[in-house]
Amino acid sequence: MTNIRKTHPLMKIVNNAFIDLPTPSNISSWWNFGSLLGICLILQILTGLFLAMHYTSDTTTAFSSVTHICRDVNYGWIIRYMHANGASMFFICLFMHVGRGLYYGSYTFLETWNMGVILLLMTMATAFMGYVLPWGQMSFWGATVITNLLSAIPYIGTNLVEWIWGGFSVDKATLTRFFAFHFILPFIIVALAMVHLLFLHETGSNNPTGIPSDTDKIPFHPYYTIKDILGAMLLILTLMLLVLFTPDLLGDPDNYTPANPLNTPPHIKPEWYFLFAYAILRSIPNKLGGVLALLLSILILALVPFLHTSKQRSMMFRPISQCMFWMLVADLLTLTWIGGQPVEHPYIIIGQLASIMYFLIILVLMPMASTIENNLLKW
C-alpha cells in the first residue's frame, strides 16, 4: 500500500513542501529565517487574536482596554508583551532574511523575490496600524504624521488623507478602521506567504555558493526540520528574554501617556524597525521628495535583480561586493540611529549623507563592484 502521506490530496501538499522536499545539502543558518518568519507570523496571529478578545477600538476606551488587558486579564500582560516584542522579532528576522537574499543572490528568483517585497510592504503596513491601536501619545501622533504624508501627493492628496482618516483629523473612525485592517492583513500575509513558498518550490532553494545544487539534494525532513526546531527554540528564547526581563526596551515611554491631540510630543518617531526609512524621509527638506524617497527606500529592493551585473550569483567569492554589502548594513544601522535622534545639527547632515550613501551603494557602487570583479577574473 502506498503511503497516505504521498497520496492524500492535502497530505501530499504538506509532504512536498516540508517532508520530501529536495533541499540543497549545504544551506547555512541564514536559510533558517524563512521558517522563523512563519513561526513569528503564527505567534502574532495567536497573541493578536487573544488581545482582540479584550480590546475595544474606541478612542475613549482603547487606552484603558490595553491597561485592563495588562492588569486584569489572566496572563494578559504576557500576551500583550509577546505581541509587541514579537513584532520586533518579526522585523529582525525579516531584515536578516532580506539581507541573506541580497548577499547570496536569491533575488534572481524573480517571482519569489517580488512576492517577498510585497510581503515586506504588507508587514510594515500591518505593524504601523498595530502601533496606533493602544492610542497612546506616540500612537496618535505617529498616525497623524505618517498618514499626513499622503497630502504631499499633488491634486488628490488632501482628499486622500481625509478619506483615510474618515474625517478631518485622526479620530474614532481612523482607530476603528485601523483595527479592522490590522486584524485582516495578517491573514492576507499568510496567503501571500503560501504563494511565496509556491514560487520558491518551483525553482528550489538557492545555496551559499550560488551554484545549482541539483546533483546534491537531501530530503527536508529530518535534516532541516531538526535544524529549524533549533532556530525556533533560539527565537523563542530571545523573545521570552525580552518579554520577561525588558518588555519595554524597544518601546517608547510616550506611548504610556494617553493620546492628546492638544499636546505634541517633543520627538515624534516610529518603532525602531521603521527608523531607517524615517531617517531617509526626514533627510529631504521637501515633503513630496521625502515621501518619494521613503517609498523608494523599500521599493528599490524590486530593482535589485535588474542591477545584478556579476557573472556569479552569490557574493561568497566576491570580496569587493562583500565590502559593499557590509557598507550597506553599516549605513542602515547609521540611518536607524539617526531616525531616533532629534532634527538638529549634526544629526541632519549625518542623515542626509547616510541617505545618499544608501541609494548610491545599491544603485551605483554594487553594480560597479560586480563589473570590476568580472574584469579581474577576465570574465
Swiss-Prot record:
PROSITE patterns: CYTB_CTER, CYTB_NTER. One of its GO terms (molecular function) is metal ion binding. Heme b b566 binds at residues 97, 196. The keyword Repressor does not apply. Heme b b562 binds at residues 83, 182. It is found in: Mitochondrion inner membrane. Keywords: Electron transport, Heme, Iron, Membrane, Metal-binding, Mitochondrion, Mitochondrion inner membrane, Respiratory chain, Transmembrane, Transmembrane helix, Transport, Ubiquinone. SUPFAM superfamilies: a domain/subunit of cytochrome bc1 complex (Ubiquinol-cytochrome c reductase), Transmembrane di-heme cytochromes. Binds 2 heme b groups non-covalently. It is a multi-pass membrane protein. Belongs to the cytochrome b family. Heme 1 (or BL or b562) is low-potential and absorbs at about 562 nm, and heme 2 (or BH or b566) is high-potential and absorbs at about 566 nm. Component of the ubiquinol-cytochrome c reductase complex (complex III or cytochrome b-c1 complex) that is part of the mitochondrial respiratory chain. The b-c1 complex mediates electron transfer from ubiquinol to cytochrome c. Contributes to the generation of a proton gradient across the mitochondrial membrane that is then used for ATP synthesis. This is Cytochrome b. It comes from Ovibos moschatus.
